[in-house]
């Protein structure tokens, strides 16, 4: 079996024009694995730490040359000569090399880039798709896309406090047909916004960022767009929100839509929304530091709607385990760079599934052309993916890769559609 011959890191750019880490792992056979690490705008306090240079003379302090040096130095030295096929063993070496809880010594960006590149190199050497390498022959389920078509919060410069308004196409019996429904709705949304005199500029994730007056106005416009596209809201296409409420939570109070609100008032707000609109999923409805609020909303709405912990769990199995024990949330957003290795990410997904929590594989707002998460979604049979809107190549790349995977799987491909949310009555 071929061994690792070369590990090489370099500084490249993400979709926001910020530096990020790319890693190449080459095997003795010539097989090559390459990976680029994404970065987030609204980040959880407990996320693994991406290492930035802090030199104001380069990229406004956001350079990643230190992380790149770590790849080319200490990491390369540790991995060259090893076989790449035991992902867990490789990742454990990386974790021990770093030696910190949050991967702050070498940088989660250096560690994750290497972890992903090793997996790709091994898959390429074996001549199998990455999803098959990660998930074996059991990876065959194509995910429902949660498409962020209206941006607010930290992802846009407008009045909307909710960070993402998503359409969730569940129709058609195949990923390609659900994607088509989402894309057609996106184009009709653009027409409606133009007719109403709103901007159709797009935000970080390819969604529109109009200066709407309220969350309800955004949801009303989405309902119109779905109908204009010829689909039925609540049947063909559902809705989802990423509130990212940690962004406006301070001293026990939510400063939301011009008012200071308690946890109880926020929960009442969500209750009204899910009665009025076909909302199937709400991400980070409560702050990552408001565990009592999370317990209450899970008790009240947990059988009606998917309650997703992102900032709450930061893809960390230890924190997820605590959430499960305390009855907090019923789903987890999974982001590779929140935890920092492929193995730990797979562990988190496995734990979620064992305890009947949904797992949604997710991009970051600062993305790249890398399509690793498309393969991860299929490998884990996660059933849901968040990878932005129907514009910007960094988002479309993931959808196109899923189309290729669906084609490759042929009759073996499965798309659950509405059944992904069978547990919820909203």
UniProtKB/Swiss-Prot annotation:
Binds a second Mg(2+) ion via substrate during catalysis. It is found in: Cytoplasm; Secreted; Cell surface. GO terms for molecular function: magnesium ion binding; phosphopyruvate hydratase activity. GO terms for cellular component: cell surface; extracellular region; phosphopyruvate hydratase complex. Its cofactor is Mg(2+). CDD domains: enolase. Mg(2+) binds at residues 242, 283, 310. Keywords: Cytoplasm, Glycolysis, Lyase, Magnesium, Metal-binding, Secreted. The active site is at 205 (proton donor), 335 (proton acceptor). It catalyses: (2R)-2-phosphoglycerate = phosphoenolpyruvate + H2O. (2R)-2-phosphoglycerate binds at residues 163, 335, 364-365, 386. InterPro entries: Enolase, Enolase-like_C_sf, Enolase-like_N, Enolase_C, Enolase_CS, Enolase_N. GO terms for biological process: glycolytic process. PROSITE patterns: ENOLASE. It is an enzyme of class 4 (lyase). Belongs to the enolase family. Catalyzes the reversible conversion of 2-phosphoglycerate (2-PG) into phosphoenolpyruvate (PEP). It is essential for the degradation of carbohydrates via glycolysis. HAMAP family: Enolase. This is Enolase. It comes from Aquifex aeolicus (strain VF5).
